[in-house]
Amino acid sequence: MASAPQTKPGIRDALIVVDVQNDFCPGGRLAVQKGDEVVPLVNAFAGRFENVVLTQDWHPPGHRSFATSHPGSKPFDSVRLAYGEQVLWPDHCVQGSDGAALHKDLCVPHAQLVLRKGHHRDVDSYSAFLEADRKTRTGLEGYLEERGIKRVFVCGLATDFCVAWTALDARKLGFAALVVEDACRAIDMQGSLAAAWEKMKKAGVERIRSGDIF
């Protein structure tokens, strides 16, 4: 029987808080159901980490992942782009907009890095490590390696997209990865949540609860 992971954060651990932004919370352009419920949890345990990274979806107007950029298409349709299949989204997290801002109640003042992703007009970005073309790096890998980070804890929005892609890429790049399940919320589109958890399990991503951190 496999032993439970050691979940108390140390100096070789980093917390990655993914896309806790207004457009992904109730009332936003691409709201994740109960997405704002992660905020008090993140605020409660983030202080346990010396190393904290916040990510922020940061799209230019007319981004290729927006349904409005594809005449005749509607949100949640899929199209084929140069790098593969792309879900089309409502316009969201447009650079400089209120929707792109981090949730007003998110309070992680000791976060050292806010990493903006999705700013290349023709490529979407779910993962905090790699753009959706699977070639363009965000620089997060090097940032963590320079600080001696060996393990990442991932939370935020949404479980089945940006959280999962971040955790999966962390594993591919050699980091241990844990997802804080109750500090995430999902879109869950056509079984995408169950599929994401299955992929993460196969990749060796650990699934924990916020209470395990304290």
Located regions from the model:
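Active-site acidic carboxylates
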Residues: 2-119, 146, 150-151, 172-179, ...
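Short alpha-helical
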Residues: 53, 161-162
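Short catalytic/ligand-binding loop motif for oxyanion handling, primarily in non-cytosolic enzymes
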Residues: 60-64, 123-124, 162-163
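Alpha-helical scaffold elements lining the catalytic groove of polysaccharide deacetylases
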Residues: 122-147, 151
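Short beta-strand immediately N-terminal to the catalytic nucleophile in serine-hydrolase-like folds
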Residues: 155
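Short Gly/Pro-enriched loop/turn and capping motifs at secondary-structure junctions
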Residues: 158-161, 184-187
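Gly/Ala-rich phosphate-binding loop of Rossmann-like dinucleotide-binding domains
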Residues: 167, 171
